[in-house]
UniProtKB/Swiss-Prot annotation:
GO terms for molecular function: ATP binding; magnesium ion binding; succinate-CoA ligase (ADP-forming) activity; succinate-CoA ligase (GDP-forming) activity. It comes from Exiguobacterium sp. (strain ATCC BAA-1283 / AT1b). SUPFAM superfamilies: Glutathione synthetase ATP-binding domain-like, Succinyl-CoA synthetase domains. Belongs to the succinate/malate CoA ligase beta subunit family. Keywords: ATP-binding, Ligase, Magnesium, Metal-binding, Nucleotide-binding, Tricarboxylic acid cycle. The gene is sucC. Substrate binds at N264, G321, I322, M323. Mg(2+) binds at N199, D213. Heterotetramer of two alpha and two beta subunits. It catalyses: succinate + ATP + CoA = succinyl-CoA + ADP + phosphate; GTP + succinate + CoA = succinyl-CoA + GDP + phosphate. This is Succinate--CoA ligase [ADP-forming] subunit beta. The lineage of its organism: Bacteria, Bacillati, Bacillota, Bacilli, Bacillales. Transmembrane segments: none annotated. One of its GO terms (biological process) is succinyl-CoA metabolic process.
């Protein structure tokens, strides 16, 4: 789950991380009122969307007067920002963050991620702050420095200092920088983050270390123990279909193809998408109904798939272990009748109660094509939608 920059900064502030003073605003009037509460000559008007690259897209403006704050707020609110992370459709700005300006001396990058290949949290730092870290990794990878955290002992202070020296943080600010690294690590662990990123982390001309921007993503599977963080969720920033899927405990991700997929198990779902591509077609979604699917859940899954106008056919690929094939078959028949499905439908069932499941499909009288294997099913649905 993602949250907005201003929410991330408020959370960082609770953990003692230094961030500039700022206030969220949902209207132009609120933006002007927020600016009036801030000290300093420069105010920063920031678009709040769940995507990076806002500055390059015109979503971050420096204002020196209240009139400029009003002007920029009027221009940005309601604007569709298109960045390298939003896709060509962009995101509509529905809220702003009005923040006091900072006298920047140097900019750095600091981020924490989980490296699944080694099963460790990795802290990354670079002197190339303010840039996309992916670009730095591609063009000047030697400027990215890493510290790997031992999960038994956690991040040690000497590692934070060592990272500071590698990044060439000014000597007089090494302790302050190291303290921020330790606090960001605490945020990452205690709130179950998947990404904790400060870009840029800046040193100021008056000798402070400040998180000028912040990005926190959280493990959705851990949100049950963070009700305060879950309350920060902004569903308007998410795909409406993914929001609807989460209500029914379905894992759904929209893709660009035309074959809807309904599968149980993430691994099988990914394999299904691969084999669809192997036969020259493109999957329209990732959809995992999980191990406890009911007829109602299958019906909701079909509705989700069909909410995508690009879908020209559906491939159901089920391996019945915990979930029984006859239950899935009943759900498929019920969903097909309720929705009035008029698209090609290929079903491959295997596992527990598979014979009963196939019998239910055969006796339904519906135009359902059955498959004997995953490859057979993928080949059939690819041929039917051509």
């Amino acid at each position: 789950m993602n949250i907005h920059e201003y929410q991330a900064k408020e959370l960082l502030r609770e953990f003692g991380v230094a961030v500039p003073t700022g206030y969220p605003a949902f209207t132009v009037e609120e933006a002007v009122a927020a600016a009036a509460k801030l000290d300093g000559e420069v105010k920063v008007v920031k678009a709040q969307i769940h995507a990076g690259g806002r500055g390059k897209a015109g979503g971050v403006k420096l204002a020196k007067t209240d009139e400029e704050v009003k002007q920029y707020a009027s221009e940005i609110l309601g604007k569709t920002l298109v960045t390298h992370q939003t896709g060509p459709e962009g995101k509509v700005v529905q809220r702003l963050y009005i923040e006091e300006g900072s006298a920047i001396d140097q900019e750095f990058y600091l981020g924490l991620v989980l490296d699944r290949s080694i099963g460790r949290i990795v802290i990354m730092g670079s002197s190339e702050g303010g840039m996309d870290i992916e670009e730095v990794a591609e063009h000047t990878p030697e400027k990215i420095h890493k510290e790997i955290v031992d999960p038994v002992v956690g991040l040690r202070p000497f590692q934070a200092r060592r990272l500071a020296f590698k990044m060439e943080v000014p000597t007089k600010l090494v302790n302050e920088f190291s303290d921020m690294v330790m606090k960001l690590y605490k945020v990452y662990v205690e709130t179950d983050c998947t990404i904790a990123e400060i870009n840029p982390l800046v040193t100021t001309k008056d000798g402070n270390v400040i998180a000028l921007d912040a990005k926190l993503n959280f493990d959705s599977n851990a949100l049950y123990r963070h009700s305060d963080i879950l309350a920060l969720r902004d569903t308007t920033e998410e795909d409406p279909r993914e929001v609807e899927a989460s209500k029914h405990d379905l894992s759904y991700i929209a893709l660009d193809g035309n074959i809807g997929c309904l599968v149980n198990g993430a691994g099988l779902a990914m394999a299904t998408m691969d084999i669809i591509k192997h036969y020259g077609a493109e999957p329209a979604n990732f959809l995992d109904v999980g191990g406890g699917a009911t007829k109602e859940k299958v019906t909701e899954a079909f509705k989700l798939i069909l909410s995508d106008d690009q879908v020209k056919g559906i491939f159901v690929n089920i391996f019945g272990g915990i979930m029984k094939c006859d239950i899935i078959a009943e759900g498929i028949v019920a969903a097909t009748k309720e929705i009035g499905l008029d698209l090609p439908l290929v079903v491959r069932l295997e596992g527990t109660n598979v014979d009963a499941g196939k019998r239910i499909l055969d006796e339904s009288g519906l135009a359902i094509t059955t498959a004997n294997s995953m490859a057979d099913g993928a080949e059939k649905i690819a041929a039917l939608v051509r």
